């Protein structure tokens, strides 16, 4: 049986830095494609910062042509204004792939950590160690790019689990 290659874009939304990571999935094999960070200057008005994120992610989608995307969910914290701004960046991160007809999944940060490291409260160093094992050719330039790759890996794992469950249910 020939397995189809699925290209997945993982996005770690942030107003200062939005990480992105692209992987290919062939069966149960993960292949690193690219990763990086879209940055916006704090000195700019919010609308221009959101536009910078939008334009950067449009370039990523256009260049790498993912078939599926995944975005990290955010939680409300003590800084309500900061949470709202992060939510706006997250909205842009979900909108860009959706505008290209790409389905967008969402994953909680603890689920990403549990999927990649095996512990829901893993730290960034543990994530980077596992990324080196799972994607040896990846060298994320920022922690945000590393997180985005972890989000893409989480989506790859959960989509395969869902496919297996559908096959078992059909028996």
UniProtKB/Swiss-Prot annotation:
It is an enzyme of class 3 (hydrolase). GO terms for biological process: DNA recombination; DNA repair. Pfam families: RuvC. SUPFAM superfamilies: Ribonuclease H-like. Signal peptide: none annotated. Mg(2+) 2 binds at residue 72. Its EC number is 3.1.21.10. InterPro entries: RNaseH-like_sf, RNaseH_sf, X-over_junc_endoDNase_Mg_BS, X-over_junc_endoDNase_RuvC. Belongs to the RuvC family. Homodimer which binds Holliday junction (HJ) DNA. The HJ becomes 2-fold symmetrical on binding to RuvC with unstacked arms; it has a different conformation from HJ DNA in complex with RuvA. In the full resolvosome a probable DNA-RuvA(4)-RuvB(12)-RuvC(2) complex forms which resolves the HJ. This is Crossover junction endodeoxyribonuclease RuvC. It comes from Afipia carboxidovorans (strain ATCC 49405 / DSM 1227 / KCTC 32145 / OM5) (Oligotropha carboxidovorans).
């Amino acid at each position: 049986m020939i397995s189809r290659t699925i290209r997945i874009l993982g996005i770690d939304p942030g107003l200062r830095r939005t990480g992105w990571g692209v992987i290919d999935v062939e069966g149960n094999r993960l292949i690193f494609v690219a990763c990086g960070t879209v940055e916006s200057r704090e000195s700019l008005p919010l609308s221009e910062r959101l536009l910078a994120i939008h334009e950067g992610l449009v370039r990523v989608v256009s260049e790498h042509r993912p078939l599926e995307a995944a975005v990290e969910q955010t939680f409300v914290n003590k800084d309500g204004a900061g949470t709202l701004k992060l939510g706006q960046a997250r909205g842009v991160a979900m909108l860009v792939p959706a505008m290209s007809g790409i389905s967008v999944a969402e994953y909680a940060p603890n689920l990403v950590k549990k999927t990649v490291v095996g512990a829901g409260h893993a730290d960034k160093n543990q994530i980077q160690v596992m990324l080196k094992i799972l994607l040896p050719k990846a060298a994320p330039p920022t922690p945000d790019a590393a997180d985005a790759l972890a989000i893409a890996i989480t989506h790859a794992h959960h989509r395969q689990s869902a496919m297996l469950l559908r096959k078992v249910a059909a028996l």
